[in-house]
Amino acid sequence: MGNSHCVPQAPRRLRASFSRKPSLKGNREDSARKLAGLFGTEARPDGDTAANRIFHYIPGTDIPGPEHHPENLEQPFLSVFKKGWRRTPVRNLGKVVHYSKVRLRFQHSQDISDCYLELFPSHLYFQAHGSEGLTFQGLLPLTELNICPTDGSREHAFQITGPLPAPLLVLCHSEAELSHWLYHLEKQMALLGLQRCHSAPPQGSLGDKPPWTQLRRAYGCGSMSGAICASRVKLQHLPSQEQWDRLLVLYPASLAIFSEEPEGLSFKGELPLSAIHINLEEKEKEIRSFLIEGHLINTIRVVCASYEDYSQWLLCLRTVSRRDGAHLPPGPESFPGLQKPTQLVGRGRGSLSSNGRSSWKLECPVFPTSQSLPESSVPTTIGFPAPPVPNQTDSNCVSTGQKKMKPSDSSPSPRGRAQREVSGSTVPLPLPLDLTKMSALNLDSGPEAQDHSLDIPHSPLYADPYTPPATSRHKITDIQGLDEFLCAIQTSPGPDLSSPFPPVSVSVPVSESSSGISSSPGPLGSHLLTKKGALQPRASQRHRGSFKSRGPQPSDFPQLVTPAREGKPSSLPPPPDEEAPIWNKTSSPSHPKWPQPRKPAVEGGFIQWI
């Protein structure tokens, strides 16, 4: 047939129209050159891609340098963010923490540009707002920035210094917006362990400090404040039963929650104190847990690691809430461990102070004993100023009504007659309860031991009922005369009638075996109240708690004084309103008796205040 070379061929420049297989290599090269021209990394010599430079405004791309932009694209701040030109898409920066429209101005410059500023967990993202819409300005990492508010300026601005040719001023529209920006910037930079501004004080060595000591939050460097309380707790988001190990940090205006990760602390959330309140009264309350409640959150149960942490948290929360005027948690009376001035209502014959003495004047707070309040528990630690010790050397001194109580039995008595409402006072130092000293009372001690025992504070609790030994030598008949019998009893005057507390009368029986009985001289006779109608067999037991230094009573003491009630009682005048009785000097049966003037015996028994 012939050779193909003999067939006439079209010109070489026209062969492309007859080609069935286009060149793949040529297409790849043409596409690469076109994309490079669009993104500005390679400019053609003919410059026909100037119209395609609109792709420079796509956010998240790698913006070329200003040497590839001879034309003015209305981006005056484009050249200052070279440090922020990372190949990092915006979607990989995390969630937006805070954003708003601000104005940017370099220091010592008058050019101001509107800009949208977005704060990510570790970056600041700038977008310019112009005629073309939002355009990418730059991306600055927080690790290379320093934030500091401007002082003495009328503008609501803060200053950013870092990888910039000059400090950059960010102008906010209001003071509230400035506070929000400073708050979020300070918090994010604190979470990264950074120093916030040039004027911030040095942190110093943190080698032996817990990691949360670096956590700070503030509304500026001038008002910077640190964490008040921090501890490891377990958090339970009700109604879920799962508990998480967290680090709870209390700041002056918020509660921050962190988790301890291998790479450091991870921020979990923050609760403003103005939006939450602490609940200590829950049905399933543990001994060291409390609830955090709020209208916009699920109830959170906080379980402290120890009771000491629990008490410290409650104390710090009450202190911060009281200062800020927020919702106060319940007072210390709702939980043990914290003490506060309290008001107690007691019933019984008297109230005991912390040193074992009773007070009729009730000028200091007195805590009722377990017998006075059978349904309540007795506090383990109490403390308040002890009443002064009465002078025992002056026989004419008016008694202050303070006496030392001996162990008394727990038999029923008319305690419902007196109801006291004692107003509390500040508790300076708690006085620990010591029941071991109750057994150290020496009933047959001399005056030296008596004076020494007055200085030793004893427990306000009653000890076990005192049972006198059968071999006791001291009998009620050993006392010759009622005056010496009264001197053996450490009594106190009747309560001030102007006081709101009703009086409680106690019978003092008189034995018929004592001859020549005389009443105590002076105002004693004018301070005797009317006798009770019937004899109470508990009167002798009640005297055992009021004896200061007399010997132990025999077991048949009630039988000795029973005949005293057989006589017809005599009517005695009531006590005057403002006259205080003066008692004779207390004496012990084991010591010489002082001579007392004799007076005619008074028929019947006397009613004596104890």
Swiss-Prot record:
Residue ranges with Polar residues bias: 371-380, 391-402
Biased composition (Low complexity): 504-526
Cellular component aspect of the GO annotation: cytoskeleton; mitochondrial membrane; mitochondrion; plasma membrane
Cell inner membrane listed as a keyword: no
Lipid attachment points (N-myristoyl glycine): 2
Subcellular location: Cell membrane; Mitochondrion membrane; Mitochondrion
Topology of the protein relative to the lipid bilayer: Lipid-anchor
Entry's Gene Ontology molecular function annotations: cardiolipin binding; phosphatidic acid binding; phosphatidylinositol phosphate binding; phosphatidylserine binding
Region of interest (Interaction with C1QBP), residue spans: 61-100
Entry-linked InterPro entries: PH-like_dom_sf, PH_domain, PLEKHN1
Organism: Mus musculus
Domain of life: Eukaryota
Domain PH, residue spans: 96-192, 227-324
Tissues with expression: Testis and adipose tissue (at protein level). Ubiquitous.
Observed effect of gene inactivation: Male knockout mice (KO) gradually become fat after 20 weeks of age compared to the wild-type (WT) mice. At 36 weeks, weight differences in whole body, epididymal fat pad, and liver between the KO and WT mice is significant. KO mice exhibit a hyperphagia phenotype with the plasma concentration of leptin higher in the KO mice than in the WT mice.
SMART domains, per the entry: PH
UniProt remark on domains: Both PH domains are essential for its mitochondrial localization.
Protein name: Probable pleckstrin homology domain-containing family N member 1
Subunit record text: Found in a complex with cytochrome c mRNA and various ribosomal proteins. Interacts with C1QBP, ELAVL1 and BID.
Post-translational modification: Phosphorylation is essential for its mitochondrial localization and regulates its interaction with C1QBP.
